[in-house]
Amino acid sequence: GPWRIHKWDSYTLKHPPAGWFVAPGSPWRRRTGYASIPATGDVHLDWSDLAKRERKKWLAQEQLEIIELDPETYCQFYARCDKSTAIIAGFTASIKRKAIAHKERLHLYGVVRRGTTDVIAGLAILDIPEIRTSLHISGFMLDAARQTPSNTGLIAHWFMTSQARGIRVCDFDGFYAKGDATSWKGFSRFKSQFGTRFISYQKAFFCIARKKQ
């Protein structure tokens, strides 16, 4: 068509100049977080006191274990979580695409009760070995996991297995920033407990301009 949308990531301006605007409900991240993983030794030393206690509970219990899942099984149980239909559909499609494109770089972990195959919580991560980074893709928790340390157990498993694969950064991806949907707040608080360091970005500016002939 004759029109183009231009995107400008400004590092200094907080407000758009004349002719530019901030898109409502912009999908671009404005805050991300990551944790550094040591080459050897404990991965939990920088965790919050609460996360450390939950890790101890996970290690002390014997009823639950973490297994690696295939994409179909992960998506089957992910579809049972309390997220919106649109979010479930979007992340399910994303997981299936990544499984085809990245194969063994995609890791899908599930918490199950020993002796069963019913997944009560899950975590999807994608390794980027070229930069020694592992990226958080999605996670879920069903009602059966709410009174258990399953989510913290999954993060501990992610950190430890990443360390064994030579990963040095576990990237939690997006965090709540002012103006985002309030539904982000709870999971953002959870992800903030693991020695997380944050990167904040200015809002992106947009401009609609006629395409040059």
State what each model feature region is.
Residues 2-60, 174-213:
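Terminal substrate-recognition subdomain of acyl/acetyltransferases
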Residues 20-145, 161:
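A conserved beta-strand-loop-helix scaffold within acyl/acetyltransferase catalytic domains
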Residues 105-210:
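Aromatic (often tryptophan-rich) hydrophobic motifs at membrane interfaces
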